[in-house]
């Protein structure tokens, strides 16, 4: 009997070892260490992202002089995708999607545009996209399509805040900071400031708390995680993910010492919790230029780094953006 019990115990241990946890349904093994948007890193580290190969494109619609192609079939909440318009003698291309005006950027003989869905965008098949193509002779054509938005994959986290940190649960502070940032990422620079090497992580270190996580603080305050956390220590140099222009460099309540960079065509990257910053508003920065050093400023209980990315005014998954093929 003892031999049988021992055998059953060994089998149970093996099964528990190999069975993966479903992050969508399983809460984290321990709550975040603080009460903010960006807790000290928790959970298992995620592998560093790698840029994908060029995917196949699908022609969605066409006129007699231009055609619209998608590099995607459906758009998950919180993600970014790529579109392409091909044709002869095209001068410029713009699109309207979910109230956002999207400028396409030229690469060789094609025009490419970034399309994004916010992490709380309702799902559905019939999301109208209108693409306006202007030709060199001044004539125009419109290419109409529908974009399907599907559910994103996000985890849930319950966070307990100590009584002496109750000020972190102030919803007005949360909303005020988000509104301030959204007024910046909602602007548009009709210029591509990044180069063909694309974007990269600001710190080459383990990824931890993911984008889009549903967070409930003390059972009352509900928030969403607008970026990814990167495990680090104090004083590590932070690099610009791509070339761009600094539109904010200062201190925020939640994000602490913070830098926001405009990369053009609706793409912004945000860097939070610096101990020191080395750039100023209006400054042009190169890819891999050091912006400052990591710290624990703002709403955090320990050194870590929060990196976020916005496209067309929406916070999107910065790691998915890195993994997406870009021309």
Provide a role label for each language-model segment.
Residues 143-255:
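Surface-exposed, glycine-biased beta-strand/turn segments
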Residues 226, 241-275, 303-308:
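Zn2+-dependent peptidoglycan hydrolase active-site motif and core
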Residues 7-17:
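Bacterial N-terminal signal peptides
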Residues 1-6:
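Positively charged n-region of N-terminal signal peptides that target proteins for export
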């Amino acid at each position: 009997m003892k031999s049988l019990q021992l055998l059953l115990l060994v089998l149970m241990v093996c099964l528990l070892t190999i069975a993966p946890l479903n992050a969508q349904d399983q809460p984290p093994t321990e709550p975040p260490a603080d009460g903010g948007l960006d807790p000290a890193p928790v959970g298992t580290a995620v592998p560093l992202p790698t840029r994908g190969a060029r995917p196949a494109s699908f022609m969605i619609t066409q006129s007699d002089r231009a055609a619209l192609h998608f590099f995607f079939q459906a758009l998950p909440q919180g993600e970014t995708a790529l579109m392409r318009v091909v044709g002869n003698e095209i001068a410029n291309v713009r699109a309207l999607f979910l109230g956002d005006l999207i400028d396409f950027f030229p690469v060789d003989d094609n025009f490419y545009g970034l399309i994004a869905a916010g992490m709380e965008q309702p799902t559905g098949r019939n999301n109208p996209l209108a693409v306006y193509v202007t030709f060199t002779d001044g004539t125009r054509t419109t290419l109409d399509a529908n974009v399907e938005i599907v559910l994103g994959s996000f985890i849930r986290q319950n966070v307990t805040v100590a009584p002496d940190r109750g000020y972190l649960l102030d919803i007005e502070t949360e909303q005020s900071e988000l509104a301030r940032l959204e007024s910046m990422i909602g602007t548009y620079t009709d210029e591509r400031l990044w180069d063909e090497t694309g974007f990269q992580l600001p710190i080459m270190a383990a990824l931890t708390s993911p984008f889009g996580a549903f967070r409930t603080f003390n059972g009352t305050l509900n928030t969403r995680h607008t970026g990814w956390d990167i495990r680090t220590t104090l004083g590590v140099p932070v690099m610009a993910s791509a070339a761009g222009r600094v539109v904010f460099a200062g201190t925020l309540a939640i994000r602490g010492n913070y830098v926001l960079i405009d990369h053009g065509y609706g793409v912004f990257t945000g860097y939070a919790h610096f101990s020191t910053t080395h750039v100023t508003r209006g400054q042009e920065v190169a890819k891999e230029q050091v912006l400052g050093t990591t710290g624990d400023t703002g709403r955090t209980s320990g050194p870590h780094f929060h990196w976020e990315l916005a496209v067309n005014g929406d916070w999107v998954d910065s790691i998915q953006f890195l993994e997406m093929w870009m021309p």
